[in-house]
């Protein structure tokens, strides 16, 4: 299958490297990453077993550090994986348990939307933290449910699999939970000021 693709279609705004760098330079931001995600309902298969739920996430090279994931088994994505949009995937422990029933997932092929991807690693979250939630806006900003599991692919493969239906998301790692909301708002202002919107 051909995994080449055109650039983003007209009207789809991508976050530039310069904009991401500006966000990373905020006083209390330790790291930032871009990603796209969608629910994986019946989109991921291993042989005849479907992942029922969970998320598929296309990630950049800063995502795993920013999201505090570590590789437990196998390897993470390499520069070559990102540069060449290689069909490789990382999964979390929940997906390994659901799809592989106690077998090692390493080197096995899963299908994502009909495209074959080789599982090169299994990841887990390394940090837990207590969020400071002061409003409903803060709650919705931080709310997510990873209980069904996560499948990760290099960001370059995302448009081939899913097109540009999902917007880019920004993930920030602040230096403390006390600064998360203020740095999130500052990043929002930078993103909005760099939108190229025309009528």
PLM region spans:
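Membrane-proximal extracellular/periplasmic loop immediately following the first transmembrane helix
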Residues: 1-43, 144-145, 168
């Amino acid at each position: 299958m051909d995994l080449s693709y055109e650039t983003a279609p007209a009207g789809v705004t991508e976050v530039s490297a310069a904009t991401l760098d500006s966000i990373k330079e905020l006083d209390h931001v330790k790291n930032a990453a871009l990603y796209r995600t969608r629910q994986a309902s019946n989109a991921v298969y291993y042989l005849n077993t479907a992942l029922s739920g969970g998320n598929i996430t296309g990630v950049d090279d800063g995502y795993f550090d920013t999201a505090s994931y570590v590789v437990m088994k196998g390897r993470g994505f390499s520069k070559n994986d990102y540069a060449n949009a290689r069909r490789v995937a990382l999964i979390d422990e929940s997906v390994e348990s659901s799809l592989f029933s106690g077998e090692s997932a390493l080197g096995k092929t899963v299908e994502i939307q009909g495209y074959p991807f080789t599982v090169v690693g299994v990841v887990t979250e390394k940090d837990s933290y207590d969020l400071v939630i002061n409003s409903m806006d803060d709650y919705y900003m931080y709310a997510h449910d990873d209980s069904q599991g996560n499948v990760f692919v290099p960001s370059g493969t995302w448009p081939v699999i899913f097109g540009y239906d999902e917007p880019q998301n920004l993930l920030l790692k602040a230096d403390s939970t006390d600064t998360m909301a203020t740095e999130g708002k500052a990043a929002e202002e930078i993103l909005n000021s760099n939108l190229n919107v025309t009528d």
